[in-house]
Amino acid sequence: MKTTYFYLGAFLLCLTSCKKEVKIEEKTIIEADTVPEVTTTTENPAEPMDSVAMHKAWEEYATPTEPHKRMTSETGTWNEDLTFWMSPNDKNPQKYTATAEVKMILGGRYQEQKHKGKMMGMDFEGISTLAYNNASQEYTTTWIDNMATGMMIATGKFDPSSKSTTFSGEMVDPMSKKSKKYRQVVTIIDNDTQKMESFDETPDGKEFKSMEILMKRKK
């Protein structure tokens, strides 16, 4: 009998609870109907890249490709003939000679060039790096030397038809202290000969050829 009363009490308790839940739900529905609808928009977050795709992307980014092979083929010692023009109408350009040691660094991912020579009666040293970015599919070159305290950085793309890479960059003019644009064109003449042409700007923004370096591989 106690068991019967127990189950009966439990049944009544459940029934009461159900009625309370129904009343609460009805009250909630009624109250919801009286509340004005508010529309909100949320931006969908970018879906996270799965670990496999991420690993593949970084592996492709880090693996040397065909442009790196071409850079590797330039390893060696190069003799350089340098010509400088100070202005568009310079009839007496300055000429110097130098040598460059070219090698690949960091597992064949970057090219390093170390230049040495004599300029204006002083020892000259310069270091340049060349990188090919697999992600952006463009080249980046940097330049520093012992006759300045700034770094020149330029980017460009290779044109297979002309076998040349055109770089564009900006530098601060030591005279005006203002930024100005410059352009460089590196042309592959043959496996052992290259030409680098640098174009500067006059104060009024006109471009002129300011430097040429003819590089020949030492055999």
Name each model-derived stretch.
Residues T3, K19-K91, K218-K219:
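Amphipathic/hydrophobic helical signal segments and adjacent flexible N-terminal regions
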Residues F6-L13:
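Sec-dependent N-terminal signal peptides
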Residues L15-S17:
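C-terminal motif of bacterial Sec signal peptides marking the signal peptidase cleavage site
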Residues P45-M49, A53, M152-A154, K180-Q184, ...:
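Asp-box/BNR beta-propeller blade signature and adjacent active/binding-site loops
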Residues A62, K177-K178, T202-S210:
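A short acidic/glycine-rich loop-to-helix N-cap element
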Residues D81-R183:
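Central antiparallel beta-sheet cores of small beta-barrel/beta-sandwich binding domains
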Residues L106, I188-D192:
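Residue-level recognition of beta-strand termini and adjacent short loop/turns
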Residues D192-D204:
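Low-complexity, intrinsically disordered Gly/Pro/Thr-rich segments
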